[in-house]
Every structure is written in C-alpha cells, then in structure tokens.
Amino acid sequence: MRLCPHTLVGVESHIAVVGAGSWGTTVANAVVKNQATILWARRSELAEQISVQHKNNAYLPGVSLAENLRCSSVLQDVVANASIVMMAVPSNGFRDVAAAVAKFVATDVPIVSLAKGLERETLKRMSEVAQDLMPHNPVSVLTGPNLAQEILAGQPAATVVACGDERVGKMIQKIVSLPTLRVYTNPDVVGCEIAGVVKNVIAIAAGIVEGMGFGDNSKATLITRGLAEMSRLGVALGANPNTFMGLAGLGDVVATCASAKSRNTAVGVRLGRGETIESITESMSMVAEGVRSSLSVLQLAQRCKVEMPITEQVAAVCEGKTNAKDALVQLMARTMKSEFD
C-alpha cells in the first residue's frame, strides 16, 4: 500500500517506525500521540488494514489503533522526510532493512533501534549494524520493561533511551514520553543493549525452571545468577555496571520473567515441559529473540573470555544439543565458588 499524496499535505516531517510487528506497532501507536507517525509494513494488505481499519490482526488481535496512525508498504514513503527513524525489525533481518533505509534517510536524522538481539554472523549489536550502514546518523536504543499489551492498555510504565549524544537522547525522550510512559535517558548504549539481549536468554532459562515445575526459590536463583552473567559480559564490553541494576537490566528481566505474555518465557516453559525447540518454533508466528540470540551471546562471551554457564546451557537446549533436565543437572553440578568471584 502506497500512501495517497493528500495524506502528506501539511506534514513536513514525521516519525518513521520501520516494522509493523507487535512492538513496532505499539511504539508507533504511542508516539503518534505526540507527532505525526508513519509505520512501515512489509505486506501491503497489513499496511492497508492498519491505515484503514486501525487494526493489526496479525500481531495485535483485538487491539484498536490510533485513527491518525498511517502505514505504508513502500519504504521510501515512510522514511523520506522523517525527523526520526525507529527500527523495529528482528535481528535476523535487521541489516537488510537498515541497508534499504539508508538509501532514503537524510543525513543526521536520528536512528533508534527497538530490537533486542545480536547479528549472528558478526555478533554485532543492532546499533552497531545501523551505524555501519548509516555512519552519519546518530544511533540510539529504546529499551526497558515494556510489554506491548500493557503499553497499549495505557498502564503506567517506564523505558530508557540510550544515546551517546545527550541532545539527541533528550529529543527522543520528549517524543516518546506520555502521561503513562516515563522515559529516562542513559548514555550507556552498550550496557542497555547488552542487557536487552541477555535478558531474553535469562527469560528462556526462567521459563524452563517454571516448565519443570520448580518454585520461586529456583526461579529467583536463576534470575539473580543470570543478572550476574549479564553484568560480567556488559562490563567486559565497556558498559557501566549500574546499567544492569536499572530499567534496561533488572527492570526488563523482572517484567519478562514474570510475564506469561513474554514469548521468550513461553518458549522456556515449553522446553521445560519436554517439547523440542523445533516443534516450538514451528508453532510460533513470531520467533522469540532469545532462541536466536543464545548462541550468539555465548560466542560473544567466549570472545571476551567471560564465563556464562546459564547462557551456555540455554544455548545448548536451543540448539538441540541437550534437554532441559540435563542442562539443569550441569548447572547444579558446577564447582563451588564465591558468589562474587
């Protein structure tokens, strides 16, 4: 679907949100309250449904979207003249879409990554991929404990804009802020992004514990030791350790691991009940990022010489090399050590 020329009359600039999955649509539906927003969908029929019916039945069934939210399947219509471009594309397709965006985006227009994953071939974070392709555009990250359905329902929440440029960070903060969504800035892009990636792996592990029928002690142990892994990797990459106790780290972990709405946690629960990763992924319309990211996180940790035993076992389960029960046995049989070594 191409936007009709009359829909752009009087709009000199707008926010572009690239990717009409559940999270991209949710963010677009939020920021359109503050500034004109155009969403990009790959499929023209979905773009028309969002623009005309104000629905996204594929990813957000039963949700009514803002009537002034527009959507197009023509990327140039969405990106041209945008004052900010938000990238809501999964990690496995991020580079290709970012390369296409780079052809149309103006120099110096801020790029905001909404994705939580690593590029499997290079182990780069999504902000690094975007910066590779758009070296003259400031790149930031939006992350935090933000479950789409709760944001859409207007429930109170907070999120983080991570940006090395304070001016750009504050501009994005203003655009995203709502009466029900408090936005903080953080200059630690590396830490915020690593937190979002590793959080998905921790969520799968927490789901496995739940699926195996274990209680709160087991889950609390898993989450706490997972946070230690997150912090070790982030600090090795130059992150601020305080980031992992904030919204991007602890906040996102708590929300995701406690939520039945989380795809990553749901995958873990099913793995814990004995299902294979193949049967789980075949049954899902949207693949959980943690399934893709677990091996990449482990490889990045090995590159940095950082020990991440929980991540190692989650990766083994997600790669079909072991089962949940044997993975737990391996974790519990590790050599005894000090908590903070």
Language model feature labels by segment:
Residues L3-V63, R70-S73, A100:
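NAD(P)+-binding Rossmann beta1-loop-alpha1 motif at the extreme N-terminus of oxidoreductases
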Residues I15, T37-I38, N137-V139, V183:
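Hydrophobic anchor at the start of a short beta-strand
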Residues L65, C71-P156, I172:
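Rossmann-like NAD(P)(H) cofactor-binding subdomain of soluble oxidoreductases
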Residues G93, F104, V129-N137, P156-T243:
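Internal alpha-helical scaffold of NAD(P)-dependent oxidoreductase catalytic cores
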Residues S113, P138-T143, V183-P187, G246, ...:
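General beta-strand structural signal in soluble alpha/beta enzymes
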Residues K199, A206-E210, V235-M245, G249, ...:
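NAD(P)-dependent Rossmann-like dehydrogenase/reductase catalytic/cofactor-binding core
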